[in-house]
Amino acid sequence: MAVIKCKPTSPGRRHVVKVVNSDLHKGKPFAGLLAKKSKSGGRNNTGRITVRHVGGGHKQHYRLIDFKRDKDGIPAKIERLEYDPNRTAHIALVLYADGERRYILAAKGMQAGDKIQSGVEAEIKTGNAMPLRNIPVGSVVHAVEMKPGKGAQIARSAGAYVQVVARDGAYATLRLRSGEMRKVPVDCRATFGEVGNAEHMLRQLGKAGAKRWRGIRPTVRGVAMNPVDHPHGGGEGRTSGGRHPVTPWGVPTKGYKTRSNKRTDKYIVRRRNK
């Protein structure tokens, strides 16, 4: 994988930094694992904007990813690595011995031709998935479930990983990249290794249009709006906003705590690093 800085042949190319991976499949994705993906423009069923800065972008198909890794005891071979427009990580097309194909997240170091497996009898090897009760303490894993059988929810983006730091009874303790320590049931599954494409963070789009290709619209400052649109809006000439920073709905920002799910507080051993 190479990080390439483009020549400044135009203002739009001057600041572009690309991450090029020659191992990725250059053809079409596997048609049997594609789903339609409709654009909402950030609107809900009533037509109102519920997510700001969303709209436009290139047409995409959703890739059906196997986050459960529940095909136990059947060896599989990685056919190829692919680009996925729906996530920062790359994905791998896996062919099982019984003929079924599935997409999984591509782990760091994973290559076409590698053998992987799921289940308690799988060996400790990058790309293999098993319950946390069978994973040695100190191991680095990704694609971790929070509820058994629900599918991976933790450490799914490019370069992400968590470390298993303890196991006590029905729960395993994980250290997340943010510094948070969290308890997860030992029957939850995880995959060995870290997610690939860690160089994604070095990418620079270089121009506003590249954001628009991805369906991301501009973010307008509140002080540049009218009073009807934002608490910071209005005033003659340039202003500072006239109050402590708030969201468009008046909720304080800049460090204001908004977490209210007390039901799951008992699973957080240590809060993330501020």
Curated annotation (Swiss-Prot):
InterPro entries referenced in this protein's UniProt entry, alphabetically: NA-bd_OB-fold (IPR012340), Rib_uL2_dom2 (IPR014722), Ribosomal_uL2 (IPR002171), Ribosomal_uL2_bac/org-type (IPR005880), Ribosomal_uL2_C (IPR022669), Ribosomal_uL2_CS (IPR022671), Ribosomal_uL2_dom3 (IPR014726), Ribosomal_uL2_RNA-bd_dom (IPR022666)
Gene3D superfamilies: 2.30.30.30, Nucleic acid-binding proteins, Ribosomal protein L2, domain 3
Gene Ontology CC terms, in alphabetical order: cytosolic large ribosomal subunit
Organism, scientific name: Shewanella oneidensis (strain ATCC 700550 / JCM 31522 / CIP 106686 / LMG 19005 / NCIMB 14063 / MR-1)
Family matches, as Pfam families: Ribosomal_L2, Ribosomal_L2_C
Annotated protein name in UniProt: Large ribosomal subunit protein uL2
Stated role: One of the primary rRNA binding proteins. Required for association of the 30S and 50S subunits to form the 70S ribosome, for tRNA binding and peptide bond formation. It has been suggested to have peptidyltransferase activity; this is somewhat controversial. Makes several contacts with the 16S rRNA in the 70S ribosome.
Keywords carried by this UniProt record: Ribonucleoprotein, Ribosomal protein, RNA-binding, rRNA-binding
SUPFAM superfamilies hit by this protein: Nucleic acid-binding proteins (SSF50249), Translation proteins SH3-like domain (SSF50104)
